[in-house]
């Protein structure tokens, strides 16, 4: 018992010594505390040498200097903001009286986007796009001129805010845009057709305004930016009588029209301020702009560009697709001329088909029942393949197979048969006629 009491007393004396009291040096000499602790004690207690018998209490250093805090502090709003994106005006409902929701800054509607290093979900990083891809000269000229013109102040000239790029499916509209953005050093704010519809009325229109203001905030910080909307006609257009035209379709068209007319005064619903935002060029892609609301695509609001790649453009893009496979340029030219009616995307799918043989060899080697264990839960890592040799004959063979699959989809049209006949009806008739049914 006496031993335990003496131990406690020794510990208490050691603690007092750490705080600069008692006899002797303030820092203990025992190796138990280590050199790092001695350094820490010396830094925390500047006046370590004191007279014997005195007891000195040293206050801890201030860890936060209030005078050094700035308005650009990234986390400053955590004490006041209860939303997760500082913009969602619907989360403020029910927390304050609707009469005071907008003008009193009480809720989460206050849409100030100058938060320090704002983290965005719509910002697209294009740093991974490397050299070697072909950019069509006409495409590059149209996009660069439109973006540059929107950042200039031209005398007595009304510049259309929106550039609409439309054309056939799979012709590389979106990818060419990304290549131009990368060449200009622009990280665009991205949207797609799937974001132009919602279960809540007005949400897509509000999202467009939010993304536009986000791009404007980046421009105000000195970074070139643009708003890029993919497949606008798929989300806001009318594709025949079976398409349901909703309030959100109307609101998306009306919002884009309003932004095109007032590009420096884009407000969120319920929140209006007098400060002008930066002008942001908008680039949209689509397949058929005749399905859009006609006043939206008039010349003063939208500049239209029909993208139909020439033979030279198709050959140039295909050289980029096969650039790592060692395919001679004359073979690429012959391949493009063999399938003149196919989209550019067809040649990318054709290249992917060549790897099917390598995948079959790997599956036969590990067994069908072990593919899941090898691919998902393997300690060996993912499988690696030697790059297959792509000869012109093999590419033509797989190309004809893809064309045959396209013809089957157009020719058979089983949906019409299912609607007109009971059960399968004559669904196998096509296979019987082609001779592949009894193989």
UniProtKB/Swiss-Prot annotation:
This is Ribulose bisphosphate carboxylase/oxygenase activase, chloroplastic. InterPro entries: ATPase_AAA_core, P-loop_NTPase, RCA-like, RuBisCO_activase_AAA_helical. Keywords: ATP-binding, Chloroplast, Nucleotide-binding, Plastid, Transit peptide. Belongs to the RuBisCO activase family. The keyword Cell inner membrane does not apply. SUPFAM superfamilies: P-loop containing nucleoside triphosphate hydrolases (SSF52540). It holds the Pfam family AAA. PANTHER family: PTHR32429, RIBULOSE BISPHOSPHATE CARBOXYLASE_OXYGENASE ACTIVASE, CHLOROPLASTIC. Activation of RuBisCO (ribulose-1,5-bisphosphate carboxylase/oxygenase; EC 4.1.1.39) involves the ATP-dependent carboxylation of the epsilon-amino group of lysine leading to a carbamate structure. Its main location: plastid. It is found in: Plastid, Chloroplast stroma. It comes from the Eukaryota. It comes from Vigna radiata var. radiata. One of its GO terms (molecular function) is ATP hydrolysis activity. The gene is RCA. GO terms for cellular component: chloroplast stroma; thylakoid. ATP binds at residues 167-174.
């Amino acid at each position: 018992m006496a031993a335990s009491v003496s131990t406690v007393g020794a510990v208490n004396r050691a603690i007092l010594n750490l705080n600069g009291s008692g006899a002797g040096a303030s820092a203990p000499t025992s190796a138990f505390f280590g050199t790092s602790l001695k350094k820490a004690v010396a830094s925390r207690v500047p006046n370590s040498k004191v007279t014997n018998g005195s007891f000195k209490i040293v206050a801890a250093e201030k860890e936060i200097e209030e005078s050094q805090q700035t308005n650009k502090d990234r986390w400053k709003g955590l004490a006041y903001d209860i939303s997760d994106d500082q913009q969602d005006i619907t989360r403020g409902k029910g927390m304050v009286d609707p009469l005071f929701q907008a003008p009193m800054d009480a809720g989460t509607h206050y849409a100030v986007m100058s938060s320090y290093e704002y983290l965005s979900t719509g910002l697209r990083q294009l740093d991974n796009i490397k050299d070697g891809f072909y950019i069509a000269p006409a495409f590059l000229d149209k996009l660069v001129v439109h973006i540059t013109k929107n950042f200039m102040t031209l005398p007595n000239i009304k510049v259309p805010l929106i550039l609409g790029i439309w054309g056939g499916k799979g012709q590389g509209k979106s990818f060419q845009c990304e290549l131009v953005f990368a060449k200009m050093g622009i990280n665009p704010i991205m949207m797609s057709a799937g974001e132009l519809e919602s279960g809540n009325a007005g949400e897509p229109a509000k999202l467009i305004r939010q993304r536009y203001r986000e791009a404007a905030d980046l421009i105000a910080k000195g970074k070139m930016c643009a708003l890029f909307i993919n497949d606008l006609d798929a989300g806001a257009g009318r594709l025949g009588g079976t398409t349901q035209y909703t309030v959100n379709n109307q609101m998306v068209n009306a919002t884009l029209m309003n932004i095109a007319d007032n590009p420096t005064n884009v407000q969120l619903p319920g929140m209006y301020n007098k400060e002008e935002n930066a002008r942001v060029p908008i680039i949209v892609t689509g397949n058929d702009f005749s399905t859009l609301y006609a006043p939206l695509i008039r010349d003063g609001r939208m500049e239209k560009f029909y993208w139909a790649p020439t033979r030279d453009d198709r050959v140039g893009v295909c050289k980029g697709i096969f650039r790592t496979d060692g395919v001679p340029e004359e073979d690429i030219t012959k391949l493009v001329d063999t399938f003149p009616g196919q989209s550019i995307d067809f040649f990318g799918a054709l290249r992917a088909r060549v790897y099917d043989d390598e995948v079959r060899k790997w599956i036969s080697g590990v067994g069908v029942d072990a593919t899941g264990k090898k691919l998902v839960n393997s300690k060996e890592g993912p499988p690696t393949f030697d790059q297959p040799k792509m000869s012109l004959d093999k590419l033509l063979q797989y190309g004809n197979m893809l064309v045959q699959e396209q013809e089957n989809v157009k020719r058979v049209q089983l949906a019409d048969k299912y609607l007109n006949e009971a059960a399968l009806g004559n669904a196998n008739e096509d296979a019987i006629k082609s001779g592949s049914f009894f193989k």
